[in-house]
């Protein structure tokens, strides 16, 4: 993966299955068969993609334009693209399973709103970034942040939780601005912790 062969471009939705492939083993719900599990993971991914021009993919021109990573951002007031898709695709599943997806949506919506409330109009939120190759996640973050800074955005916000490698953000220049416990996902033995980070662009 040489820098001169890398190209940052607008994300193409036809590549969404490649993103889902990466996070599917990490975000499997505890209920349903493999078909539902993948549906629910795609639902979570789509909950992080907005109707805007801040959807990117990093490709390697030396490898037939292979998709190396993807990154999705949200501004205050942006809308996510998931509602119509969910209404259509969820019809094949029973109400019990759709309730599980509803729990995911409640959590995602709450954390998005909590993060957006901390932001100013000239701040932007990193909703999701996914790497398919070692180092490609850091690279797309570097390139997109350069572009965002040039456009005048001031700060980058994101939220994550204890299921993810949240320590990575501390090591890469982000400041922890809020830490909470999400009771519905907590157990007697372990609190389910959520984190909101900020970094100056």
List each language-model region with its residue ranges.
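Conserved catalytic-core motifs of GNAT/GCN5-like acyltransferases
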Residues: 157-159, 175-193
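Conserved GNAT acetyl-CoA-binding A-motif
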Residues: 120-125, 148-161
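Glycine-rich phosphate/pyrophosphate-binding loop shared by adenosine-nucleotide-utilizing enzymes
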Residues: 4-6, 64-70, 124
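A short beta-loop-alpha structural element at the N-terminal edge
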Residues: 3-21, 75
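Active-site rim helix/loop that mediates acceptor-substrate recognition in acyltransferases
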Residues: 32-61, 72
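Short hydrophobic/aromatic beta-strand element in the GNAT-like acyltransferase core
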Residues: 53-57, 70, 128, 194-196
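Conserved acetyl-CoA-binding loop-helix of GNAT-fold acetyltransferases
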Residues: 133-147, 171
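Conserved acyl-donor/pantetheine-binding loop and adjacent beta-alpha core of acyl/acetyltransferases
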Residues: 75-128, 184-189
């Amino acid at each position: 993966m040489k820098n001169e062969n890398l190209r940052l471009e607008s994300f193409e939705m036809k590549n969404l299955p490649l993103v889902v492939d990466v996070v599917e083993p990490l975000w499997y719900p505890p209920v349903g068969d493999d078909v539902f599990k993948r549906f629910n993971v795609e639902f979570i991914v789509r909950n992080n993609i907005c109707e805007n021009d801040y959807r990117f993919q990093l490709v390697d021109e030396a490898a037939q334009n292979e998709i190396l990573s993807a990154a999705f951002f949200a501004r205050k007031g942006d809308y996510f693209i998931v509602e119509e898709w969910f209404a259509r695709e969820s019809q094949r599943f029973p109400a019990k399973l759709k309730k599980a997806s509803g729990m995911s949506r409640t959590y995602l919506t709450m954390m998005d709103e909590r993060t957006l409330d901390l932001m100013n109009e000239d701040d932007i939120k990193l909703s999701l970034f996914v790497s398919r190759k070692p180092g490609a996640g850091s690279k797309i973050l570097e390139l997109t942040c350069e572009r965002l800074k040039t456009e005048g955005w001031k700060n980058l916000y994101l939220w994550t939780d204890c299921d993810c490698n949240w320590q990575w953000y501390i090591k890469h220049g982000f400041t922890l601005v809020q830490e909470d416990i999400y009771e519905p996902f907590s157990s007697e033995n372990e609190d389910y912790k959520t984190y909101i980070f900020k970094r100056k662009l």
